């Protein structure tokens, strides 16, 4: 359990290894400057002031985040940032500036901003404010005492979000109401001490994500159903369900204890039989049977309680589904407010008419301008075929004039144009050797072949 004496012995800071910048060990001149005190006013030398503040303020917050703490004290920071036996002389000014900017907040001020009556009688340390702190605040002294606890606002919000996710992912989230002691056990690793745990609950309470109530001397916590939902006050249904859950746990523990007792009686009867003590063995067996009957009765009660809880959980699920359906119907009605079948049909007809008009315009534009000339497509196709046939014909080699003057009908009659005849005559006239007498007369060779009669 936490106590002020134990907390005073253990610093909240610790070793800041791994967080220190390179100049911490390499630049003696700069570190001497950073460890020196601030001037009385920033106006004296704003450059030096901003340089020191830009170094220490992020380092203090990052050190706290690395250590997983949300509560700071000047004394702990001075011990954590010692260097070669020297402590930073300007840390108090740094904390004052962080307080002014709202990144830090006095623990007492934070508690005053939230309804913390549920812990005022349980954790009295929150009400212990030394007289010198109260007097300094009344007199307007902004100096930070070495023992005063400050809260890192952003780190506390992050820790509260972590605890909320931890609860949501645990079996405790089956019902929004949970015992404070069970929640404290669940958050033991996230919250290093009891004061941090209570500060986290206060932050969640400030965000309206939890509410705390004392019931029969025991504190219970109710969580909001969703991450963005607001928690509702604890009602009779919540208390009834919580009592049923406590009864279930109590009956389960009792059944487990009686089961162990029945097993013990069975072992005693076995040992008595081995020792020949028949009467003792019979008494042990009778005790075992009585215990088993009690277990059966407790099982019946436990089944009843669990059945009621199952029905409650089912009804809560049904209520959630009903609310979702109701919200969906409302949204659908709102979205279909101005939509009717007649309007939909009219809209479709307009779209079809516009599409038809667009098709007609496209066809008209695709027709082009003919300049008043109409062409027959079939005649154009025939003429194109004739041109293709002429271009695909290869030139034929003329055969030698046969010696036999009797020609058959199978010999083709080649057609020779006038231009070809003129070219052939020109070649003959320019020949050097002239014509060789032969039975093949060029003139006859060039003449069209006649069919014999």
Swiss-Prot record:
Residues recorded with modification Phosphoserine: 232, 410, 417, 431, 441
GO biological process, one term: autophagy
Cellular localisation: Cytoplasm; Nucleus envelope
Swiss-Prot/TrEMBL keywords: Coiled coil, Cytoplasm, Nucleus, Phosphoprotein, Protein transport, Transport
Modified residues (Phosphothreonine): 408
Region of interest called Disordered, as start-end residue ranges on this chain: 1-22, 392-417, 431-453
InterPro entries: Snf7_fam
UniProt feature, compositional bias: Basic and acidic residues: 392-403
Coiled-coil portions: 243-312
Pfam family, one: Snf7
GO cellular component: amphisome membrane; autophagosome membrane; chromatin; cytoplasmic side of plasma membrane; cytosol; ESCRT III complex; kinetochore; kinetochore microtubule
Gene3D superfamilies given in the database record: 6.10.250.1710, ESAT-6-like
Biased composition range(s): Low complexity: 10-22
Chief site of localization: cytoplasm
SUBUNIT field: Interacts with CHMP4B, but not with VPS25. Interacts with LEMD2 (via C-terminus).
Task performed by this protein: ESCRT-III-like protein required to recruit the ESCRT-III complex to the nuclear envelope (NE) during late anaphase. Together with SPAST, the ESCRT-III complex promotes NE sealing and mitotic spindle disassembly during late anaphase. Recruited to the reforming NE during anaphase by LEMD2. Plays a role in the endosomal sorting pathway.
Protein family (similarity comment): Belongs to the SNF7 family.
Protein name: Charged multivesicular body protein 7
